[in-house]
Amino acid sequence: MQYDIAAIVEGYAQGYFLMADERDRLSWYGSRDRTFIPLDERFRYPKSLQRVLNQERFTVAINRDFQAVVAGCADRETTWISPELEKIYWLLYQSGYAFSFETWQGDELAGGILGIVIGGAFIGESMFYRIPEGSKVAMVKLVERLRQRKFVFFDAQMMNPHLERFGAYRVKDEGYQVLLEQALQRACNLV
């Protein structure tokens, strides 16, 4: 099957995101509000995670094993990442839009965050871990990177208790569209 990568990127640039349903049918979705991970002083994390960061047990990499991160994100009891969506992520990666932000412990992939970068927007698609704290360390290090690279926002799409612990907050669609427009005007590089 052929995919129009430009049209897919345009869908994300308009504020939509792809998800597969329980029958693996892929559709575009929107939301009345989005969840942002703060890139300012509102970002926080548990003190216990600071101890892990101080121990420097993990190293960070970008796109060292993109396909393993996609597979890790898809490998759960209920997933919205169908085999078709995995192919699309691979094509977005090859086109310079999809990235994996990874933590490693030696030669073992500890965790990662799968995201799409368009301008100054980082759109987090999913995250996973294989080693405890692996994805949490990835979150902290990714926020540091996005700050350094002057990204406008980190869109985590949907709120959950895990993200709340990092200071995640909701943005109504009108506000999201304004910030998205600002992000699209900025040329940011994750790498």
From Swiss-Prot:
GO CC terms: cytoplasm
GO annotation (BP), single: protein catabolic process
Reactions the enzyme catalyzes: N-terminal L-lysyl-[protein] + L-leucyl-tRNA(Leu) = N-terminal L-leucyl-L-lysyl-[protein] + tRNA(Leu) + H(+); N-terminal L-arginyl-[protein] + L-leucyl-tRNA(Leu) = N-terminal L-leucyl-L-arginyl-[protein] + tRNA(Leu) + H(+); L-phenylalanyl-tRNA(Phe) + an N-terminal L-alpha-aminoacyl-[protein] = an N-terminal L-phenylalanyl-L-alpha-aminoacyl-[protein] + tRNA(Phe)
One protein family per Pfam: Leu_Phe_trans
Keyword entries, A-Z: Acyltransferase, Cytoplasm, Transferase
Localization per Swiss-Prot or TrEMBL: Cytoplasm
UniProt-recorded Gene Ontology molecular function terms: leucyl-tRNA--protein transferase activity
Enzyme Commission designation: 2.3.2.6
PANTHER family listed in its UniProt record: LEUCYL/PHENYLALANYL-TRNA--PROTEIN TRANSFERASE, LEUCYL_PHENYLALANYL-TRNA--PROTEIN TRANSFERASE
Function summary: Functions in the N-end rule pathway of protein degradation where it conjugates Leu, Phe and, less efficiently, Met from aminoacyl-tRNAs to the N-termini of proteins containing an N-terminal arginine or lysine.
Similarity comment text for this entry: Belongs to the L/F-transferase family.
Protein name from the UniProt record: Leucyl/phenylalanyl-tRNA--protein transferase
Organism of this sequence: Nostoc punctiforme (strain ATCC 29133 / PCC 73102)
Gene name of this polypeptide: aat
